[in-house]
């Protein structure tokens, strides 16, 4: 019976997927017809009114067709073909003229689906209409973008995540409306904001107010789900399945996210609590909003600001301050740094920073950048993801290497490795004070994660962080990746400067040509 149900679910999934593909195809056909109609009309120097008279169709209807919103019936297409002096088959053909071919390829690819145009106030049909009026040069540019996307295997996942990162940076990674929603939530449900917030009090709201069932047992029945943190099964009584192996901080964080989805009335969301299942921009954005809400709920704004003020007021660097604050709120290191990043510009004027999260696995020397926010700075770590040879002098990578060596297969998932560095980017005047925390991942003892926040060193930082020049803080020259770095005495180098040598060779050739 169980296998039969699974087969039915798979069939339903295929039907839904095919229906979505069919809808996309229909939209594509409508847009192509609109482009062709507009081009043919303009080639014949006809206004919409003139074409309306010739075809006996209304101006408004023709306008809807050209915008890709309507697809006329066969007899109306025949009227249009006769009015334009073209064959019926030529008008309905999906083949476009040479200058419009790149637009057809753009529509036929999944690139436009990756771009969250609606979130930036851009209407897809208007965008296509503008492109149809473009010059041959712009058409060539579109074709180039498509080729670049194909050659670099640009994925929807990368596109959406890049769009989200830019969205956060545009808003300075701070959202007052979410902050106010959290304050209202605390008042409405009469919660005590003093840390740590009670797990039972928050789950009680989910159960009583939103009719949830919380299940921490069923996960053990499926070994395939061990890497996931939680799954929501929607229904009249939603069931939240939580991975029982999560830490208390991780569980309450998920509870906070579920409260956010319900309280903020967010419906377009992923039901799986895992970054592996966040591919569309809407899911990514709403996941970020719910995570922001949960973090702001668990790390109370006023109390957290007071704790950070005390931390920044210290004359000497002391890693215990960070550990104590994390433990006080029963938070994860990422929640701590995320909250600090959200508030740093608004509260302390520290609005120039790098936020980085790296993952690594035992037995490898690979470090993957899995989350990044860069605010008002020149450095671009994520722009070099292809090589993976990030500078091994970064504090986030340095402490990952140390914790891997220290544990060496030992299960010590609560242990935190804290680091700090005063760094200067090679051949620039850009300096940073960076803090980082690394931990063994709670669901896999062979996997490790570090989170780092690096503030740009300027007069504002010097006025706020009193221990910035503590001699105990090591100073290091760093770079982006080994591929573009010409430091000759770097003991941490993981790769030869291959890219830099190619660039230098090209420059040498150019200089030689100029001397001829």
Summary of predicted features, one role per range:
Residues 1-24:
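Short, intrinsically disordered or compositionally biased N-terminal tails of bacterial proteins
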Residues 10, 25-32, 39, 43, ...:
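Short juxta-domain linker segments that transition from a proline/glycine-rich
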């Amino acid at each position: 019976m169980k296998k039969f149900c699974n087969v039915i679910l798979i069939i339903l999934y295929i039907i839904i997927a095919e229906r979505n593909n069919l809808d996309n195809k229909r939209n594509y056909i409508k847009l192509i017809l609109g482009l062709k109609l507009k081009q043919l009309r303009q080639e014949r120097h006809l206004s919409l009114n003139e074409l309306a008279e010739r075809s006996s169709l209304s101006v408004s209807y023709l306008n809807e067709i050209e915008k890709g919103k309507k697809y006329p019936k066969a007899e109306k297409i025949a009227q249009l073909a006769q009015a334009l002096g073209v064959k019926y088959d030529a008008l309905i053909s999906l083949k476009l003229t040479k200058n419009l071919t790149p637009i057809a390829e753009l529509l036929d690819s999944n690139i436009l689906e990756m771009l969250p145009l609606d979130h930036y106030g851009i209407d897809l049909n208007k965008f296509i209409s503008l492109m149809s009026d473009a010059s041959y040069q712009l058409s060539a540019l579109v074709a180039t973008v498509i080729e670049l996307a194909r050659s670099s295997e640009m994925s929807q996942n990368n596109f959406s995540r890049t769009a989200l990162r830019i969205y956060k940076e545009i808003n300075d990674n701070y959202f007052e409306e979410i902050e106010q929603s959290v304050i209202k939530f605390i008042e409405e449900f009469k919660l005590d904001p003093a840390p740590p917030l009670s797990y039972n009090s928050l789950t009680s709201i989910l159960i009583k107010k939103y009719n949830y069932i919380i299940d921490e047992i069923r996960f053990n029945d499926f070994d395939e789900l061990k890497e996931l943190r939680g799954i929501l099964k929607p229904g009249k009584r939603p069931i939240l399945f939580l991975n029982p192996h999560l830490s208390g901080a991780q569980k309450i964080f998920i509870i906070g996210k579920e409260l956010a989805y319900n309280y903020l009335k967010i419906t377009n969301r992923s039901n799986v609590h895992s970054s592996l299942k966040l591919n569309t921009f809407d899911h990514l954005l709403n996941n970020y909003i719910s995570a922001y809400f949960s973090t702001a709920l668990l790390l109370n704004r006023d109390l957290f600001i007071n704790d950070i003020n005390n931390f920044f007021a210290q004359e000497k660097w002391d890693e215990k301050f960070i550990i104590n604050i994390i433990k006080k709120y029963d938070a994860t290191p990422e929640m701590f740094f995320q909250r600090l990043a959200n508030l740093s510009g608004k509260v302390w004027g520290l609005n120039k920073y790098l936020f980085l999260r790296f993952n690594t696995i035992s037995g490898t020397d690979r470090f993957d950048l899995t989350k990044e926010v860069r605010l008002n700075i020149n450095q671009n770590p994520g722009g070099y993801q292809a090589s993976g040879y990030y500078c091994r002098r970064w504090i986030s990578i340095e402490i990952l290497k140390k914790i891997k060596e220290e544990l060496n297969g030992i299960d010590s998932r609560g242990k935190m490795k804290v680091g700090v560095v005063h760094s200067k980017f090679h051949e620039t005047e850009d300096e940073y004070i960076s803090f980082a925390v690394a931990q063994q991942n709670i669901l896999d003892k062979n996997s490790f994660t570090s989170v780092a926040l690096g503030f740009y060193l300027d007069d504002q930082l010097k006025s706020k962080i009193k221990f910035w020049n503590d001699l105990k803080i090591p100073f290091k020259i760093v770079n982006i990746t080994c591929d573009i770095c010409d430091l000759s005495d770097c003991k941490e180098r993981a790769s030869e400067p291959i890219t830099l040598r190619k660039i230098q060779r090209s420059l040498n050739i150019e200089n030689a040509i100029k001397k001829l």
